[in-house]
Amino acid sequence: MRLNSKQPRKQRKFLYNAPLHLRQKMMAAPLSKELREKYKIRNLPVRVGDKVRIMRGDFKGHEGKVVEVDLKRYRIYVEGATLRKTNGTEVFYPIHPSNVMIIELNLDDERRKKIIERRAG
């Protein structure tokens, strides 16, 4: 994920054309103080099932589980952060992962546990 250029247009081009395995890394969010002390890691990529607190925007302060991670649009969808359309249906509000804080990790995946152990040192 090395990008040498400082030019904004090349930074944007990299974001638009990034492959999925690099997009996943760019979907990282900071951990809460308790998790940071426990795992000795500052941030992790957000996954479905993680519990997050929204720190910025209209839904600031809301907490909920991540329902969907949209790598194409660089957005996540959180339970409780919904909008009502004019026809009455509820839709999830897209939130950038930098605007949330992970407060509870989904550790069902063994590979994720190994990643956390490896990064913790």
Swiss-Prot record:
Q: Which Pfam families match?
A: KOW, Ribosomal_L26
**UniProt keyword Signal, yes or no:** no
**Which Gene Ontology terms of cellular component type are present?**
large ribosomal subunit
Name a single GO biological process: translation
SMART domains the UniProt entry points to: KOW
Record GO terms (molecular function): rRNA binding; structural constituent of ribosome
Q: Which UniProt keywords apply?
A: Ribonucleoprotein, Ribosomal protein, RNA-binding, rRNA-binding
UniProt family annotation: Belongs to the universal ribosomal protein uL24 family.
Complexes and interactors = Part of the 50S ribosomal subunit.
What is the role of this chain?
A: One of two assembly initiator proteins, it binds directly to the 5'-end of the 23S rRNA, where it nucleates assembly of the 50S subunit.
Know the name of this protein?
A: Large ribosomal subunit protein uL24
Source species of the chain: Pyrococcus abyssi (strain GE5 / Orsay)
